[in-house]
Amino acid sequence: MKSLIPFLLTLFLASSFWLEGKVEDTKRPSVLLINVDDWNDWNSVLKGHSQAITPNIERFAKKGVTFSNAICASPSCVPSRPALFTGIAPSRSGNISNDSGKRPWRFYAGPVTITIPKLFSQNGWASIGIAKNFHRGDVPEFDTYIPPFKTPKKLKKVGLNLNSSAIWDIADMPVSEMGDYKAASAAIKTIDSHEGPLLLSVGIYRPHVPWIVPQAYFDMYPPETLKLSERRVKDLDDLPERLKLVAGLEAKFGKGYHEKLVRKGYDKQFVRAYLASVTFADEQVGRIL
């Protein structure tokens, strides 16, 4: 089940790596944290899919430490992100599903819990958040917060899910208009201009659905050569009952969703769109690095 669980890709870099030419505070090195949304092990490092094109993650992995057995605290955004930033497990906080998002994450974490950005701020770092970090409620935690950039809705409307809403599509626009591209650009500008110890936390939204990226990323994965992962029969049977419920509610496995995709011939299109989004995300990570 590891390959089905999205994770937050966390990249830490000391200031000596990415603040070249600037005076370092050796006691307080700058830290870069990149959160990539819903990216499983489909990359050229963990090799969850043999055709994933992710040269930037691969380049970074060769310079650092790869935690190949790391799993996020929860397979849903609302509980997973606060768990990362507070160190409090969902099983302890009670923030266990996306339905928990009806209340702010602080309700579950408690009023006195100190988050990672607050801890840095209290100890001499400037903390800057860009785009999606906490899944709502970012503003009070960072000294400076830049909200997610919206992508203009210029779509070719070619990929619909079974409810006729866009779950994948081709963005009919330059890559520079994509929200994640703008977030990466804001991160680059911050790195280039900031002086002194810095915690910079950047959120990259793709490959979260909808898988909408420009045509060039789809072209990297020709449908006729695309491989589908082997489907494991009764793959959910060994899960605890609670996780079976999560799978049914969140991933729609309990509703025969995958069977419908296969029957309608959409499975390869979905794999292609996800991989295209993965490569797009990898490119934004590479620009920041």
Question: Positions of the model-derived regions?
Answer:
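Positively charged n-region of N-terminal signal peptides that target proteins for export
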Residues: 1-4
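Short, structured active-site-proximal loop/turn typified by the sulfatase FGly-forming signature C/S-X-P-X-R
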Residues: 45-81, 87-88, 92, 124-128, ...
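Loop/turn elements at helix/coil->beta-strand transitions in domains of secreted/extracellular proteins
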Residues: 27-31, 63-68, 123-127, 195-200
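Catalytic-site neighborhoods of secreted/periplasmic enzymes
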Residues: 83-176, 215
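Active-site-proximal cap/lid insertion segments
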Residues: 26-29, 38-51, 149-182, 189-289
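Boundary at the C-terminal end of the N-terminal hydrophobic targeting segment
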Residues: 21-23
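Bacterial N-terminal signal peptides
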Residues: 6-16
